């Protein structure tokens, strides 16, 4: 089975093209148009070309003399073209590029009406491919339905081809509109054309209906500059009468476009006075200061009005100081006020938040130097005459010669002249203990023996060894009736002191010996042995005195045992 398509009669019939153009114009204006197109779309030229489409029969469902139904595969790559004409809006503020909401977009009054530009579009180089269902009947005409989207590509040429963005936009929009046209509008257009050809009743019915007048041309455009507004005003806002407007001309020196409408001036005033938020015609709110208008000067004035914010610098300087617990045990004469001293042991807390004002006041304030009340008991560099201060401070004694022995020093050999006395030793200051202070307050007299002149001789090897092994520095004697040289400090180690205390207790059990002196020693003993015996007698007498004071209960109270203990030895001489 074969079919013969005669494409040339369609090209030769002038009435066919006219009817097809009218139907295409109605179909293009039926669907909603994009906002950039502000006028109707008119089909000014239509040509089917000389190349017919290619059809391939896939299925034949019904075949008779007056009807046919079948499925075809169609492909078209001919030279048909279509020319459209319309007008588009050239206002850039009202185009497809706007993506923000309308309430947030400014709408200047100068471009509210929009500028329209004529646009001519030519569609050519159609590429179609799809499946077509064809139904033919002499009583009902021809019905063509596309099962898929047949449009593959086409070429769009317009007056804005020099602008790439507009060209691409028109290409996309027209392709979308043609796809809708092929699927929805083209089958209806073909059906109506077939009815005119084969159904005489439809042709007579259509001839009785008057055709609607379609404007062929729009004529010359009106010059908006020569048509003043209804309520014209000049640049100063003064209303103009009709006589003044009539007297104006293009040659009068006053241009017509300087006339503004009073309504437009009011809108411009509202635009100027608006807060520039949301819509431009938002009514202003009284007694409201927007944050965009508040600067540093306004913030400074707000802070000086008497209302302090929580983070203001004035509050960040408020601090509370907590002193260390050790400061309560210090001497009252050496403790300074907390406001004049800042130490590392003190903890400071902010008065309003822990981090307010941190790092602003890092420089420490100048403070007074803390006084140190320390008595220097060490040696003096210059040898002076020693002075002994009694407990009551009544008198002083000076010793001309006093011998001091130390375990760390070895005595040098003396000169050949045994008469020459050595230099006076350094001063040894000994503060009386509390026992001596109490005994002085009770009226006890402490006898001071005059200084005893000692001469050195060449010591023997055994005596020197004994002296070095048992160091016995001299101490003042605090016993009654004992003639001992003053300013001789006796310092024992812990092991020697314990052994001597035991021996002293044994001697005190037999009774005190107040008559003990250095004269009891053998005359043949050496001078060093006599000095050592004198020191031992002084220590025994002092221990006896302390025991007697404890028996007499001179120190009542819970601290008497602590007070009665032997005071620590003085600094090394």
Curated annotation (Swiss-Prot):
GO BP terms: mitochondrial genome maintenance; mitochondrion-endoplasmic reticulum membrane tethering; phospholipid transport
Name assigned to this protein: Mitochondrial distribution and morphology protein 34
Self-association and partners: Component of the ER-mitochondria encounter structure (ERMES) or MDM complex, composed of MMM1, MDM10, MDM12 and MDM34.
A GO MF term: lipid binding
Subcellular location(s) of the protein: Mitochondrion outer membrane
Protein family membership: Belongs to the MDM34 family.
Matching CDD domains: SMP_Mdm34
Membrane topology field: Multi-pass membrane protein
Keyword Calcium: no
Keyword check for Transport: yes
Main location: mitochondrion
One cellular component term from this protein's GO annotations in UniProt: ERMES complex
Lineage start: Eukaryota, Fungi, Dikarya, Ascomycota, Pezizomycotina
Sorted UniProt keywords: Lipid transport, Lipid-binding, Membrane, Mitochondrion, Mitochondrion outer membrane, Transmembrane, Transmembrane beta strand, Transport
InterPro entries registered for this protein in UniProt: Mdm34 (IPR027536), SMP_LBD (IPR031468)
Free-text comment on this protein's domains from its UniProt entry: Lacks alpha-helical transmembrane segments, suggesting that it resides in the membrane via beta-sheet conformations similar to those predicted for other outer membrane proteins and porin. The SMP-LTD domain is a barrel-like domain that can bind various types of glycerophospholipids in its interior and mediate their transfer between two adjacent bilayers.
Chain segments carrying region Disordered: 301-326, 349-433, 499-521, 550-573
PROSITE patterns: SMP (PS51847)
Job of this protein: Component of the ERMES/MDM complex, which serves as a molecular tether to connect the endoplasmic reticulum (ER) and mitochondria. Components of this complex are involved in the control of mitochondrial shape and protein biogenesis, and function in nonvesicular lipid trafficking between the ER and mitochondria. MDM34 is required for the interaction of the ER-resident membrane protein MMM1 and the outer mitochondrial membrane-resident beta-barrel protein MDM10.
Domain of life: Eukaryota
Positions with biased composition (Low complexity): 306-316, 396-409
Coiled coil location: none
Compositionally biased intervals (Basic residues): 360-373
Segments forming domain SMP-LTD: 1-195
